[in-house]
């Protein structure tokens, strides 16, 4: 099993509740009070009225919808996430990033045809987004189109050499092609970036394992587990799932070494 990695605030309502005093028109002192306070009341009304009538901007609305969509995707509610991203795109059809976001949710839900369509549309709108190339490469790898995947990972890294996810995913793909030495180079570079270390150590350990260097594999598996024990460790798919995968790989490696019963 290979674990590839894919890459708003609600506006506060301003309610101005204004109260006006009823002034007597029969008593002269009351008239003097009215003349003295009327200008101040008008100044308050003028200052408050624009705030009370201020509508939410299109940008604020998109930000709020996008935040809701991302939260829905994180909890696995793909239908809601897709519906929200679609709503954003209906209002802003030139948003390449939201085509990429919706494409990723389609990919996660298994709708590959719509996923690749959204990735292609995102790149047609903006060919400089390295995250789209990384996501489209993951699509190609899942389809067994490894050459296309490698080319897209290369494109992502040409645009952004610090895209650790692209280095990680390219290493996994090269390993699947049994190009273990080149895969290790990708993982080594990813580790220099200092992010997603637990995941990178796990995948590098798996590469050593499959290449026959069991000592190096065990060392990297242990390093990955140690990184998962650190606070605020961010790993694609969650720390628990990654730890389980590492334990499966370790058991697979150690099984031939156990004495027969």
Regions found by a protein language model. Give the residues of each.
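TPR-adjacent "capping" and linker segments in tetratricopeptide-repeat scaffold/adaptor proteins
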Residues: 47-64
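Conserved alpha-helical positions within TPR/SEL1-like repeat arrays
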Residues: 63-74, 86, 97-108, 119-120, ...
């Amino acid at each position: 099993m290979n674990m590839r990695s894919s890459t708003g605030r609600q506006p506060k309502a301003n309610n101005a509740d204004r109260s006006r005093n009823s002034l007597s028109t029969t008593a002269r002192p009351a008239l003097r009070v009215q003349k003295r306070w009327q200008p101040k009341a008008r100044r308050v009304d003028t200052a408050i009225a624009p705030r009370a009538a201020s509508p939410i901007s299109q940008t604020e609305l998109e930000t709020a919808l996008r935040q809701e969509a991302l939260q829905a995707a994180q909890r696995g509610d793909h239908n809601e996430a897709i519906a929200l991203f679609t709503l954003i795109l209906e209002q802003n059809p030139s948003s390449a990033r939201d085509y990429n976001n919706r494409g990723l949710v389609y990919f996660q839900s298994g709708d590959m045809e719509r996923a690749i369509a959204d990735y292609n549309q995102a790149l047609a709108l903006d060919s400089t987004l390295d995250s789209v190339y990384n996501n489209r490469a993951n699509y190609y790898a899942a389809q067994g189109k490894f050459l296309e995947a490698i080319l897209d990972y290369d494109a992502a890294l040409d645009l952004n050499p610090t895209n650790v996810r692209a280095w990680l995913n390219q290493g996994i793909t090269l390993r699947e092609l049994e190009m273990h030495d080149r895969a290790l180079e990708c993982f080594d570079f990813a580790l220099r970036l200092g992010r997603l270390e637990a995941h990178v150590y796990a995948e590098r350990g798996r590469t050593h394992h499959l290449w026959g260097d069991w000592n190096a594999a065990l060392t990297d598996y242990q390093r990955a587990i140690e990184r998962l024990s650190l606070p605020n460790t961010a790993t694609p798919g969650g720390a628990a799932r990654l730890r389980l995968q590492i334990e499966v790989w370790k058991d697979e490696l150690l099984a031939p070494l156990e004495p027969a019963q």
